[in-house]
Amino acid sequence: VPYAAWLGQPGYLAAEVLLALLAGVHYSLADDTISALGTGCDSPTSTGCSSASWAMNLVFVVFGALQAVGAVPLLRQDAARARVVGWLWVVAGTFSVGVGLAPVDAHPTLHSLVALPVFVAQPLAVLLHARWLTTGRVRVSGTALGVAAVVGAVAFAVLLGADSWSGTAERLAIWPAKLWLPLAALTQLRSRRRAFGLP
């Protein structure tokens, strides 16, 4: 089950893009934040919001919970580094659930507080997971995704509140994890099969 939880993470990307396209108002993936998709629209002429905000908030909750559950095998390992990475994934996933439970239009301060750990823990989780727990091409790919996520998190902090490119920066911070997690899960599954002498 934990591995399946991570294998399904790219579904988050599909859900987010689909909801952006079906927002019912003018919404820009480049300029509007992800949280805006969880924000209800005051009128048909509103921008940077969604007519189906409940759906995006549900996506935050479901995929955040799956992300945390997928980290359970790491928490059970003896190596301290594996447990550190595991807890980073748990923190990022748990607070992602909080983002969905506290939409920015209903609870702006709480939303900001629960979103902040995601932008710290998740990029670090990708980068450290790749550097500490993988080798070869998987390590190279994960490191590239981790660096991109860190750059995105810093850029988003700088651009927060700007009229342009904040959505791009936020997605650069968040999306790499959704690409990395299935790769990490497959790597762990292969290692486990080898440990049991399976092909």
Task: For the regions a language model picked out, list residue spans one by one.
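Terminal transmembrane helical module of multi-pass membrane proteins
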Residues: 130-199
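Interfacial helix-start motif at the membrane-water boundary
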Residues: 39-65
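Transmembrane alpha-helical segments in integral membrane proteins
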Residues: 7-8, 60-80
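Membrane-proximal helix-loop-helix units in multi-pass membrane proteins
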Residues: 89-130
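Hydrophobic cores of alpha-helical transmembrane segments in multi-pass inner/ER membrane proteins
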Residues: 59-69, 120-129, 176-190
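Interfacial/capping segments of alpha-helical transmembrane domains
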Residues: 21-35
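Membrane-interface loop-to-helix entry segments
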Residues: 52-62, 109-124, 169-172, 176
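N-terminal signal-anchor transmembrane alpha helix
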Residues: 1-25
